C-alpha cells in the first residue's frame, strides 16, 4: 500500500502527524500524580495562609556554539552563517510566578551553593516582606548542606520545595528558558561573552515588562495546575 494512501486513512481516522513529547523513562507517574493532587495544593494553601508568594525556579545556559534556525538556499548550496571562532557562554538562574513576575540573575561560573544563595538573597529582598515559597527541580546543589542550612536560618522569609524527579514539564520556568533561547538567537550571532550577556539581559528585561507573556506559560496543559 502506498505511503500516501496510509496517510489518507490515518487522516480519516482522526490521526495527524505530531511531534512527540519527551518524557524520561525514570519518571514515576504515581509520584507526579501525588504532587499534583496533594503536594502542590498544600504548598498553595500554605502560601495563601502565610501571605507568601509561590515562585518556580530553574537554571539554563546560552552557548556561542549552539546552532538554531534554518535558511533557504539553492539545492546543493549550503548557506554559510558567520560566527565567532571562540567559544563562550553565560548562565542564568530565574524564577517566575503565575502573576507574571520574573526575576533573574546572570553568572559566568558553575552554579555552586554560594551562587545560589546569592540569588536567594535577592529573592528575599525583592519579596518586600512576603515569604518566598520557591519550587525547584532536584539539582544536587539545590539540596546541598550549605543551601539547606542557609534557608533553615531564614524560615520566616523563604522555604524550598522540590518537583518530582524527572518531571521538567511541570516547571513553568522551563517555558521561560525556551522563550529566552528563541528570542536571543535571532539576528546576528554574538561576537563575545559580553555581547551574549547583553543580549540575554535585554531579552529578559523585555520579558519582565510583559507579565502577560509570563502568565501565558501557565496556560499550557502541563502547567495549568499552577495557574
Each model region followed by its residue ranges:
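Short beta-strand segments
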Residues: 55-57, 132-138, 161-164, 218
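RNase H-like two-metal-ion nuclease catalytic core shared by retroviral integrases
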Residues: 29, 137-138, 145, 161-185, ...
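Extended, low-complexity cationic-aromatic segments
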Residues: 12, 34-121, 222-225
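RNase H-like polynucleotidyl transferase catalytic core
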Residues: 21, 77-86, 152-172, 188
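C-terminal anion-handling pockets and recognition modules
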Residues: 5, 50-52, 173-227
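Conserved short alpha-helical interface segments
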Residues: 1-27, 53, 60-62
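Generic structural signal for small/hydrophobic residues in well-ordered secondary structure
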Residues: 6, 58-60, 94, 120, ...
Amino acid at each position: 500500500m502506498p505511503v500516501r494512501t496510509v496517510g489518507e486513512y490515518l487522516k480519516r481516522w482522526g490521526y495527524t502527524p505530531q511531534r512527540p513529547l519527551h518524557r524520561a523513562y525514570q519518571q514515576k507517574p504515581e509520584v507526579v500524580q501525588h504532587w499534583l493532587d496533594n503536594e502542590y495544593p498544600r504548598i498553595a494553601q500554605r502560601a495563601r495562609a502565610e501571605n507568601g508568594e509561590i515562585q518556580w525556579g530553574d537554571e539554563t545556559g546560552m552557548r556561542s556554539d549552539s546552532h538554531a534556525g534554518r535558511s533557504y538556499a539553492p539545492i546543493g548550496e549550503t548557506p554559510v552563517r558567520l560566527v565567532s571562532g571562540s567559544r563562550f557562554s553565560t548562565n542564568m538562574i530565574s524564577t517566575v510566578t503565575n502573576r507574571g513576575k520574573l526575576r533573574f540573575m546572570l553568572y559566568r561560573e558553575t552554579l555552586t551553593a554560594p551562587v545560589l544563595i546569592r540569588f536567594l538573597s535577592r529573592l528575599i529582598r525583592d519579596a518586600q516582606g512576603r515569604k518566598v515559597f520557591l519550587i525547584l527541580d532536584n539539582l544536587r546543589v539545590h539540596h546541598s548542606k550549605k543551601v539547606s542550612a542557609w534557608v533553615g536560618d531564614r524560615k520566616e522569609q523563604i522555604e524550598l520545595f522540590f518537583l518530582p524527579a524527572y518531571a521538567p514539564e511541570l516547571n513553568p520556568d522551563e517555558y521561560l528558558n525556551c522563550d529566552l533561547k528563541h528570542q536571543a538567537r535571532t539576528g546576528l550571532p554574538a561576537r563575545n561573552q559580553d555581547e551574549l550577556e547583553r543580549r540575554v539581559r535585554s531579552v529578559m528585561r523585555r520579558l519582565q515588562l510583559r507579565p502577560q507573556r509570563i502568565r501565558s506559560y501557565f496556560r499550557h496543559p502541563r502547567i495549568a495546575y499552577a495557574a
